[in-house]
């Protein structure tokens, strides 16, 4: 059996285009990497189209700016957005599979969900309001379990 050799791309915090992901997949395939952990959600952005929940991409895929992690209080003022349609996600999965790489999609829950809470307030227990996170770290707000 082949060894488990994986790479992870965190598109939740920083969106990467489909062509860029394909280039990365090509590079990792050349190194016999066989698993791709595709980190699709994070407090800072929801990156996968879910047709039943369109606000996840209409609201959750966009943040107004980013507080720079190395400077704590400095804001870059640069909006960040982007998500993958279901067709694009299928395209990436097939592209990787053609190179013997298995894609493992990752969706955080119940924590790291400010993107979803900003999109659907009814998912929270505390009433909000919420916005897609502009800083990095750990937040207390999680999905309501009941």
Predicted ranges, named:
Residues 1-140, 146:
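Feature activates predominantly on carbohydrate-active enzymes
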């Amino acid at each position: 059996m082949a060894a488990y050799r994986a790479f992870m791309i965190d598109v939740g915090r920083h969106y990467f285009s489909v062509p860029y992901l394909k280039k990365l997949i090509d590079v990792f395939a050349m190194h016999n990497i066989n698993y791709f952990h595709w980190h699709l959600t994070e407090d800072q952005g929801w990156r996968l189209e879910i047709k039943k929940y369109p606000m996840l991409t209409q609201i959750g895929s966009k943040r107004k700016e980013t507080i720079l992690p190395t400077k704590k209080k400095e804001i870059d003022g640069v909006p960040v957005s982007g998500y993958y349609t279901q067709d694009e996600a299928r395209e990436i999965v097939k592209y990787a599979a053609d190179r013997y790489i298995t894609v493992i999609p990752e969706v955080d829950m119940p924590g790291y969900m400010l993107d979803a809470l900003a999109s659907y307030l009814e998912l929270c227990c505390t009433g909000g309001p919420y916005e897609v996170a502009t800083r990095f770290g750990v937040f207390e707000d999680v999905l309501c379990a009941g």
